[in-house]
Amino acid sequence: MLFILIFSVMESLPTELAYHVLSFIDFNSVVTYRLCSQESNNFIKSMLVFFPINFNNLVDQSTNYFEFVEKVDLQFCRQITDEFLSSFCRVKIINLRGCDKITDSGLKHLQHVKEINLAGCYQITNDGLLGLNNITFIDVSYCPKITFKGFANFNDDSVAVVQTRPLEYPKSKPYTLVDKKKINIRYYNNHPFLGKNNHAFQKDTNQSHSKNSISYLPRIIIAPKKIIDKIETERCRLFDSIYAVKPEFRDRVFMKNYEDLLPNTHLYDKQSALNRLYKKSNRRKFIDNLLSNKMDIMIGGSIGLFCTHKRCNFEPNDMDLYLKYIDSEKIRKIESIIYQSFIFRSIVVIRTSITITWLIQSTTDEITSIQLNIMNIKSWAEVFITYHADLTCIGYEILTNKFVYLDNRWNNILQNDTNYFSNILNMESANSIYKAASKYQQRGFTCVSLNDLCTDIQGNIAKSYDHHIYDSLVSLLSDKIYNKLNIHTSDTGYQNYYQKKYTNTNLIHYIFDKYRMSENISFASSVSHLQLPKIYPDIIMLSVYKINEILDTQQNNNTGTEFHQLSIHKQKNYINKTEKFFYSARSGAQYTGINHYNKLHTVCIVCKCGCDSFMTMNDFIGCQYEYSLDRGICSRIQCREYEYLELFLV
């Protein structure tokens, strides 16, 4: 066998070079070669002082091959349990980041460990740490059951990484005394081995890039004013109609069954549409697992269009997921299903203001993107009314096994050959809408933008597009009020998105190209690491939208007045507290630009202890959401009790 020949050659190599070659060989081949002879067994044992395990389907049955290991990387091996760790009696350095099935019982097998990463092992408690008597470095980020009491048996001057800050953690002291021992508390992991692929991966995205220029995109027609006014009015009326209906009835009234449009020469029949949806086996397995877990999810975006419309000249490598009544447990369940459904080389999880995206790199280097929208929605109609164009207002509802669409939007494309893109009901800049229209123009559809890129702050037509000039009302407001530019709420399209294969090296380039102009973005190793607030918010972002007068008096639930999905529950009694913040910015918000909007909706966070302290969006737009809540507020407010409030500028 070829791998036996490879190992035979390796035995003659210097140790350092043999280590390097071994890192490119899969785990099963290593184990198989060990069983060939006594000599091969001895060679592998000598090499297994450290061996990287970089796949996610490692299970407890593989426990007999690690008795000589002293340094091991098991991060993201989600299937291993406490039993698996019983073989690591000699290990001194171990990375268990994201191994969330590990409990205190498993740590009893690691008596000789000196350096360990337990980030995301949320079942670990103080009792488990008390048995680790030789610790010099530990990462317990996102382990909510651990406090300082768990550090009592650590060595003096040990380093403890605690990226999520419990109530008792100090505000700024680098050292803390625990049972007369000096513990070095850190909020980041820079360990040369245990810190690789750490929770945050940030790059400066403030610089302009030539590929972001409009000149790189196919020319899109700008609609005349008469058409713009007509379509804006129609979409705003539909928006008002949807939000005038109680949430539990919205889908029944506004969502229609795709099969009602059949037969149609432009559309596939249902079975053909399902065949296109299930074309990839891993996608089918993922959808089947969502169904077996009874997840009330709709798959929207471009994949719905690909499955149903015959004009599509593309095959998406992504899935956009929408989940009703979202909460942190449902998010964790989705991530668990992802790990069950895909065999992958690596996963990068990216958090923006309204999405969590899993970039899944398979063992053949193919990229699959699963993007979960984390807006707190109650109906699919709320999702589709915010879409840029009618073109993508169709999706697959998993529980009912149906393709569904928003009436008076997606069915329009069967009568009208032209697809109009707008930013009426969201905060996208005209630049972003132009790029979205360009993407679908490349995909074989006729697209027209309702937003003129070449407009300055006063509304005058500019001779050419300049990215330094405000291109929308949102850019103006975000700069005047928050001193932030290029704030995006969703991914914008670049021509180089759609390569199908990426190596380990250029995967990072893919990510950076995709998100480079977005400031409000964070990278996390696992959703289980994201500390979501007790009262789960709808969304945290700057949003300009129309508030329906009907909803000011209509009580739809016991929490108060319901607003558009880009909102936080209204808390009128706190508005006076933050008036001083908005006083200086009020003059900059007088210009509304679009007559459909009559209020600016924004949000801040206030302390509930009565100290009148608060943190505005100015402090955490563009920051990592989960860190800013814990670190930003706690650096100023003594307690961790906080809540969200809604503020308006009229």
UniProtKB/Swiss-Prot annotation:
Pfam family, one: F-box
InterPro entries: F-box_dom, F-box_LRR-repeat, LRR_dom_sf
All copies of domain F-box, residue ranges: 7-53
PANTHER family linked to this entry: MITOCHONDRIAL ATP SYNTHASE COUPLING FACTOR B
Name of this protein: Putative F-box protein R757
